[in-house]
Swiss-Prot record:
GO CC aspect terms: cytosol
Record's subunit section: Monomer.
Source superkingdom: Bacteria
Organism: Chlamydia trachomatis serovar L2 (strain ATCC VR-902B / DSM 19102 / 434/Bu)
Designated gene of the protein: valS
PANTHER family reported for this sequence: VALINE--TRNA LIGASE, CHLOROPLASTIC_MITOCHONDRIAL 2, VALYL-TRNA SYNTHETASES
Reaction(s) catalysed (UniProt annotation): tRNA(Val) + L-valine + ATP = L-valyl-tRNA(Val) + AMP + diphosphate
Subcellular location: Cytoplasm
Main location, first listed in the record: cytoplasm
Name of this protein: Valine--tRNA ligase
Length: 939
C-alpha cells in the first residue's frame, strides 16, 4: 500500500482542520426550517464570555454533538444553535479587574457608556476564541444561527417577556430582604449564594427591661446588628419568659424601646431561649417582623458600613463596628460572655464577600402562579429528566421556590425596561424601540431604571430567543421549538433548567424541551504533599504530571479527587489535550466518562488510552484497506453469496446487529459511557482481535477458496463502512477521514443497491460525507440456528487451549498440535477447528476417537468435547519435576494444619476466627493438591 495514500500513523493535526473546513464549506451544518424531515433541535448552553472553554464546556458540547450527529445520520432535520452568554456579574467583574490591571482605573472612573464599550470589546475577543475552540472540538453547530444573550433579537425577547409578566402583575417591585454583595454592590438570587461552615463566636448580650431592674439575655452571632433591633422574641411556652411578653426593653446605644414578643418559631433550647429580632438584616427575623408588623431599620450602606441609623458607630465597617460594640457593651455591663460557635455563612459565588441580608427595593417575579405547572410538566413526563434520580431534586426545588429577585445593580446586562417619573410614583413598562411616548414628550420628567436584569432572566428565554420569538411567524420557531433535549450539568438544575421551564412556558404555554440530561461534574486528581509538621500544599507542574501518568506516590503525598480548581492544580485544559492527543481522543474520553452519577473522575491516563484506540482504529482500517484495495463499489453492489459465509462471518454480523440494538437503547436514555464502551469493544475485540484473526489465513491465501476470499473482502468492506458510521458521532474526524478514503478506493457507486448484507454500505457510499450518510441498520442474513451457542463453544475451546499453554509454560510463539475427541458433535467441531487454529495458536487440530497412546498431552473438557494439547517430550520432565515439588509442599502444609486442627487444646483456646482461617486454608490446600494430582495424571 502506498505510504502517501495511507500513512502508517494517524496524525490528527494534519487532518482535523481540513475535515472541519470540508464540512462547513459544504453547508452540512445548516438546518432547513422548510424541510419535511422530522425536526431534532438542541440549543447550546451558552458559555460565558469571560474567558476560554474549560473541560466542562468540552464535555457538554461533546455530548450534544454526539446526539446531533447521531440524529442527523438517522434522517432528522437537525438544528444545533450555538451561542454565548453575557454573564452579567461574571463578565463585569472580569472586565473591571482587566481595566484596573491595564489602565489603573475603576469602573466608576468611566461613564456607563464608556465602560460598556470596554465590555463589548472584551465580549468580541472572548467570543471569537470560544467559537474557534468549539470548532476545534468538532462541534457541528449551525453557525448561521449563532446567538448571543444580548444580541438585538435577545434584547427584543427579554423586553417582551418582561412586559408580559409586568402586565400580568407577576413582576413587581418592593422592599425585600435580599442577598447583598457589598463588594460588587448588587443583589444576588438565593441560588447565587454559596454557604460555608465557618468558626466564629456566639455573643451573649443583656437588654434592660423598661421600668424594671430585670434584664433579658440573648445570644447572637452578629452583635453589630443590635443597632437595628425592633423586638426580642421568646417562645410563648417558655416559662422563663412568659411574664415578660408584652414588656419592653431598651436597645443599647440608640435608646430605642422595643417589645418582647411571643413567637412559636423561637427555639427555646438555643442560647438563652431569647433572640433579638433585626428584620432588615436576617431572613428569619424578616419573616417574624412581617408577622408582627415590626419596623424594619436598615443600619448598613451598600458598601457594608454602618449608616446614619447607627449613631456613634456611623461610618464604621461591619467588622470594626462589631469590635467597638462589644467593647462598649462591656463598659456598660451589658456583655455577658462569648462562646466558640460554628455556623453556615453565606458567601458571594462571584466575589467571595460575606453576604449581607439587606433591605432593598428590588424587582421580583412572583412564582406562586407557576408552581403547579412546573410540577405537572415533570410529573406527566412532558419533560423527562435523566437520570431519573434528579426528578426528586427538581420537585424539591419547585416546592420550595421563593419569589425571584431579578434586578441587579450592574451596568452590564439587559436594562430593565421601566421608566420612573421623577415627581410621583408612576412607572411605564415599555418593550419597543427607543422609549415610551410619554418619555419622548417630556424626557426631563422621566428616567429609566438604572438596574439590569439577572442573567438567568435572559438565559431562561434561551430556547425561544434562539428560534426567533417573539416573532410567532418565525419558521425556525414553528419547526424547531420545543427542542428535543437540554444537556447540562446537574449543578444548574435550579439555576437554569427550572427557570427555562418557568419563563418559556409563561410565554408560549409549552415546555421548552422534551428531555433534560444532567451530566456529572468533572473532578480531577489533586495531590497533597505533607511536611514533617503535618502541614500540606498542592503538588503542581511536572511532578503532578508524572503522578497523573502513574508514577508511584511517596508516603507523604496523598491523592484525592476534587472539583477542578486552579488553586488545587488539577485543572485539565481541553485545548491542551486536543493539541496533545487529538480531538477524537478527547471526545471519546469524555463520552466514556459521562456516567449518570453526580461526579466524573477524569483520569489523565484515559486520554492516552483512547489515543491508542484511535491509532488502533487507523491501523485496523489500514489492514482492511490492504485487503479490499482491489474491490470496487460494483463488487459491493453485486452483494454476497451467503452460502460461502462461515461461522465466524455469521458471528460478526450477529454481534454487529446486537451492537446497533444496544447502542440505540443507550442513546434513548443518554448513557454515553455505555455507547462509547460498546463501540470501542466491538471494533477492538470483536472485529480486530477475534474476526480479523480468524479470517487472516483466508485473506492471505493459506486456506479457503478464491470465492471465499472474495466474500471475506466484501464483508470486511461492508463492516468497515458500517462501523465508521457507528463511531462517527463520537469520533467524527478520523471516521470522516477513513470514509473519504473508502470512497476514493472503491470508486463511484453506480445504480446497484447491493443485497441484504452490502446494501446499506452501498447506500452510505453514495453520501458526500460520513456525517450525512444514513446511520447503519441491522444486516439481514439467514443466521444458522444455535449460532451464539456454537461460537461460544469455539471461544471456550480456544480459552482451554490458551489455558493449557499458560499452565504448561509453553512458549507463546510456538505453534501447538491439538486434538479433539467428540463423537456426538463432530460437525460443530469441524466449524470450530479454523477458529481454534487462528485464535489458539494451534498449527493442527485432529478429530480422534480416543486420546493418542504414543503422545504426551494435557487435556481439557468443554461441553463434553475433550480438547488436548500435545506436549513436547523435553517439557514433560520439567513439568513433572515442578508439579512434584508443588505436591510435596502442599502435602506438608496439609499435614501440619491437619495436626493443628486435630488438637483439642488449639480448638478450645485459639480465637474462633483463627480456627476458621486454618480450616479455610486446609480446604484450599486440599483443592490445590487435587488439581496437581490431576495434572500429574494427565501427564
Amino acid at each position: 500500500m502506498n505510504e502517501d495514500q495511507f500513512p502508517k500513523a494517524y496524525d490528527p493535526k494534519s487532518s482535523e482542520t481540513g475535515v472541519y473546513s470540508f464540512w462547513e464549506r459544504s453547508g452540512m451544518f445548516v438546518a432547513n426550517a422548510s424541510s419535511e424531515k422530522p425536526a431534532y433541535s438542541i440549543v447550546m448552553p451558552p458559555p460565558n464570555v469571560t474567558g476560554i472553554l474549560h473541560m466542562g464546556h468540552a464535555l457538554v458540547n461533546t455530548l450534544q454533538d454526539t446526539l446531533i450527529r447521531y440524529k442527523r445520520m438517522q434522517g432528522f432535520e437537525v438544528c444545533w444553535v450555538p451561542g454565548t452568554d453575557h454573564a452579567g456579574i461574571a463578565t463585569q467583574t472580569v472586565v473591571e479587574r482587566h481595566l484596573k490591571a491595564s489602565l489603573g482605573k475603576r469602573r466608576t472612573d468611566f461613564s456607563r457608556e464608556e465602560f460598556l464599550k470596554h465590555v463589548w470589546d472584551w465580549k468580541e475577543k472572548s467570543q471569537n476564541v470560544i467559537l474557534s475552540q468549539l470548532r476545534q472540538l468538532g462541534c457541528s453547530c449551525d453557525w448561521s444561527r449563532q446567538r448571543f444573550t444580548m444580541d438585538p433579537g435577545a434584547n427584543r425577547a427579554v423586553k417582551k417577556a418582561f412586559k408580559i409578566l409586568f402586565d400580568k402583575g407577576v413582576i413587581y417591585r418592593g422592599y425585600y430582604l435580599v442577598n447583598w454583595d457589598p463588594i460588587l454592590q448588587t443583589a444576588l438570587a438565593d441560588d447565587e449564594v454559596e454557604y460555608e461552615e465557618r468558626d466564629g463566636w456566639l455573643y451573649y448580650i443583656r437588654y434592660q427591661v423598661v421600668n424594671s431592674e430585670e434584664f433579658i439575655t440573648v445570644a447572637t452571632t452578629r452583635p453589630e446588628t443590635l443597632l437595628g433591633d425592633t423586638a426580642i422574641a421568646v417562645s410563648p411556652e417558655d416559662q422563663r419568659y412568659s411574664h415578660l411578653i408584652g414588656a419592653k426593653v431598651v436597645v443599647p446605644f440608640v435608646n430605642r424601646e422595643i417589645p418582647i414578643i411571643g413567637d412559636f418559631s423561637v427555639d427555646a433550647s438555643f442560647g438563652t431561649g431569647a433572640v433579638k429580632i433585626t428584620p432588615a438584616h436576617d431572613k428569619d427575623d424578616y419573616k417574624t417582623g412581617m408577622n408582627h408588623q415590626l419596623p424594619m431599620i436598615n443600619i448598613l450602606t451598600s458598601t457594608g458600613e454602618i449608616n446614619e441609623n447607627g449613631g456613634i458607630f456611623t461610618g464604621l465597617s461591619r467588622e470594626v463596628a462589631r469590635e467597638n460594640i462589644i467593647t462598649s457593651l462591656e463598659a456598660l455591663g451589658l456583655f455577658v460572655k462569648k462562646e466558640a460557635y460554628s455556623s453556615r455563612v453565606g458567601v458571594s459565588y462571584r466575589s467571595g464577600a460575606i453576604i449581607e441580608p439587606y433591605l432593598s427595593k428590588q424587582w421580583f417575579v412572583s412564582v406562586d402562579s407557576f408552581r403547579d405547572s412546573l410540577r405537572e410538566f415533570v410529573n406527566s413526563e412532558e419533560i423527562r429528566i435523566f437520570p431519573p434520580e434528579f426528578v426528586r431534586n427538581y420537585l424539591t426545588w419547585v416546592n420550595n421556590l421563593k419569589d425571584w429577585c431579578i434586578s441587579r445593580q450592574l451596568w452590564w446586562g439587559h436594562r430593565i425596561p421601566v421608566w420612573h417619573n421623577k415627581h410621583d410614583e408612576n412607572v411605564i413598562c415599555f418593550d419597543g424601540e427607543g422609549g415610551p411616548e410619554e418619555v419622548m414628550r417630556d424626557p426631563e420628567s422621566w428616567y429609566q431604571d438604572p438596574d439590569v436584569l439577572d442573567t438567568w432572566f435572559s438565559s431562561g428565554l434561551w430556547p425561544l430567543t434562539c428560534f426567533g420569538w417573539p416573532d410567532e411567524d418565525s419558521l425556525d420557531l414553528k419547526k424547531f421549538y420545543p427542542t428535543a433535549v437540554l444537556v447540562t450539568g446537574h449543578d444548574i438544575l435550579f439555576f437554569w433548567v427550572t427557570r427555562m421551564v418557568l419563563m418559556c412556558s409563561a410565554m408560549v404555554d409549552t415546555e421548552p424541551f422534551s428531555d433534560v440530561f444532567l451530566h456529572g461534574l468533572i473532578f480531577g486528581k489533586s495531590y497533597r504533599e505533607y511536611d514533617e509538621k503535618g502541614e500540606w500544599f498542592y503538588v503542581s507542574g511536572e511532578r503532578k504530571r508524572d503522578y497523573d501518568k502513574g508514577k508511584a506516590l511517596p508516603k507523604n503525598v496523598v491523592a484525592k479527587w476534587e472539583k477542578l480548581s486552579k488553586s488545587k492544580g488539577n485543572v485539565i485544559d481541553p485545548i491542551e489535550m486536543i493539541e496533545a492527543y487529538g480531538a477524537d481522543a478527547v471526545r471519546l474520553t469524555l463520552c466514556s466518562c459521562a456516567n449518570r452519577g453526580e461526579q466524573i473522575d477524569l483520569d489523565y491516563r484515559l486520554f492516552e488510552e483512547y489515543k491508542n484506540f484511535i491509532n488502533k482504529l487507523w491501523n485496523g482500517a489500514r489492514f482492511i484497506f490492504g485487503h479490499i484495495s482491489e474491490l470496487t463499489s460494483r463488487d459491493l453492489e453485486e452483494g454476497v453469496n451467503q452460502d460461502l459465509l462461515g461461522l465466524e462471518d455469521f458471528y460478526i454480523l450477529d454481534r454487529f446487529n446486537e451492537l446497533l440494538d444496544l447502542i440505540d437503547g443507550h442513546y434513548n436514555c443518554y448513557s454515553f459511557d455505555k455507547i462509547a464502551s460498546l463501540a470501542y469493544d466491538f471494533f477492538k475485540n470483536d472485529l480486530c482481535s477475534t474476526y480479523l484473526e480468524i479470517i487472516k489465513p483466508t485473506l492471505f491465501g493459506k486456506q479457503g477458496s478464491d470465492q471465499q476470499r472474495a466474500t471475506k473482502r466484501k464483508l470486511l468492506a461492508t463492516l468497515l463502512i458500517n462501523i465508521l458510521g457507528v463511531l462517527h458521532p463520537i469520533v467524527p474526524y478520523i471516521t470522516e477521514t477513513l470514509f473519504q478514503k473508502l470512497k476514493a478506493t472503491l470508486g463511484t457507486v453506480e445504480n446497484g443497491k447491493g443485497d441484504s448484507v452490502t446494501g446499506h454500505a452501498v447506500s452510505m457510499l453514495r453520501s458526500e460525507a460520513c456525517m450525512v450518510a444514513e446511520y447503519p441498520k441491522p444486516i439481514h442474513v439467514a443466521f444458522p440456528q444455535g449460532l451464539r451457542e456454537s461460537f461460544g463453544i469455539a471461544e471456550r475451546l480456544v480459552y482451554t487451549i490458551r489455558n493449557i499453554r499458560g499452565e504448561m509454560q509453553l512458549d507463546p510463539r510456538e505453534p501447538l498440535q491439538a486434538f479433539v475427541i467428540s463423537s456426538e458433535k463432530k460437525e460443530l467441531v469441524d466449524v470450530c477447528i479454523p477458529i481454534m487454529c487462528a485464535l489458539g495458536g494451534v498449527k493442527t487440530v485432529e478429530q480422534l476417537a480416543e486420546a493418542p497412546k504414543d503422545s504426551i498431552f494435557s487435556l481439557g473438557v468443554v461441553e463434553g468435547i475433550q480438547v488436548g494439547v500435545i506436549l513436547p517430550p523435553e517439557h514433560l520432565a520439567k513439568e513433572r519435576v515442578r508439579l512434584e515439588k508443588e505436591k510435596t509442599r502442599l502435602e506438608k502444609s496439609i499435614d501440619s494444619v491437619s495436626k493443628l486442627l486435630a488438637s483439642e487444646d488449639f480448638r478450645t483456646r485459639a480465637n474462633p476466627s483463627l480456627v476458621q482461617a486454618k480450616k479455610d486454608s486446609l480446604r484450599n490446600s486440599q483443592r490445590e493438591l487435587q488439581s496437581i494430582l490431576d495434572k500429574l495424571a494427565s501427564l
